[in-house]
Amino acid sequence: MSNMFVADVGGTNIRLAQIENGQIKAIKKYLCTEFDTIAEAITQFGDDVGQDSFEHGCIAIACPVNHDLVKMTNHTWQFSKKALRDELSLSQLHVINDFSAVAHSLPTLSADQVIKIGRGEADPKGNIVVFGPGTGLGVEHLTLTAAGWQTLDGEGGHVDFAPNDEIDIVIWRYLKEKLGRVSAEEVLSGRGIVNIYSALAVNAGEPEDYNDPADITERALAGTDTLCVAAVTQFCRIMGSFAGNLALNLCTTGGVFIGGGIASRLGEFFVNSEFRQQFEAKGNFAGYVENIPTYLINEPDHGLLGALAYLLQQTKETN
């Protein structure tokens, strides 16, 4: 089928892919600000790839998609799903959350599209979880049903932060006084890196020289600031503990995947961190989680791949 498109829409860019025989044929990226509406962007894409019209489409977008009216939180675009489908003369239009698309990409990823961290082998039919520290902390589960892979939506990034060591307690106390309640997102996100750094600085009686996560991670990777190194080191440890909790929540024997931009930017620092050690530090259940693999997603097009996987599953169900 060559009359299909998928889109991955963020606050800055929209990336679109033309589909032929169930595979991505061509990819184009545009600035969202180039177009007044998303319909204009999709129409321009069709012109650029020589496709007069599409029959099926799937849009993965970074905002809530529960209702017919979709309003982006980090851009001016808004649209009615039904009206957009009619405007583009589509038989089917599916609109899913961008993190749901990431989840749907996971069963399609090959070994060279991920970086495996630690031991464990995936059960191909086992439950899967993906989480992604970024601007916030997204969490999504996948489970295999007779109809195919189904996402289990939730707000896992907003569970309570559970301290595991003395440094965690220092961070928790600092944020508890500052925020009242400390969620996982307050330590596992861009601002989470800043929060950890600030807590360690205050505890050590040192000045808080940096308030940008990029500045802190840059100095941690370069090894030029001991407090920045300590903050990012603890960030990786906390991420491991959180990932282990997710694995236990739904027995994710199919693997735990890490998306979002932060972990991938940390690169070797993250791979060589104590992430996996903390992931397996589950007391009586250490033997269980040590058999669950953990992966860092290393595929820049995973949003498009996930939207495609979802679209193919939906068109198969209706045929």
Task: Spell out what each predicted region is.
Residues K116-S183, E268, E274-E280, A286:
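Glycine-rich phosphate-binding loop of actin/hexokinase-like ATP-binding domains
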Residues M1, D52-H56, L90, K125, ...:
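A general structural motif
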Residues Q92-D123, A214-T226, T233, S241:
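ATP-dependent carbohydrate kinase catalytic cores
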Residues I14, P64-N66, G136-E140, N195, ...:
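Short, acidic Gly/Pro/Ser/Thr-rich loop/turn segments
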Residues M72-H75, H94-A101, G120-D123, V130-P133, ...:
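Active-site nucleophile and cofactor-binding loops and adjacent substrate-binding regions
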Residues G10, G57-C63, D98, P133-T135, ...:
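Glycine-rich beta-strand-to-loop/alpha-helix junction loops that act as flexible
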Residues V49-V95, S100-Q113, R265-E268:
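Short beta-strand-loop/turn "lid" adjacent to the catalytic site in phosphate-handling enzymes
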Residues M1-Q51, I169-N319:
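ATP-binding/phosphotransfer module of carbohydrate and carboxylate kinases, centering on a glycine-rich
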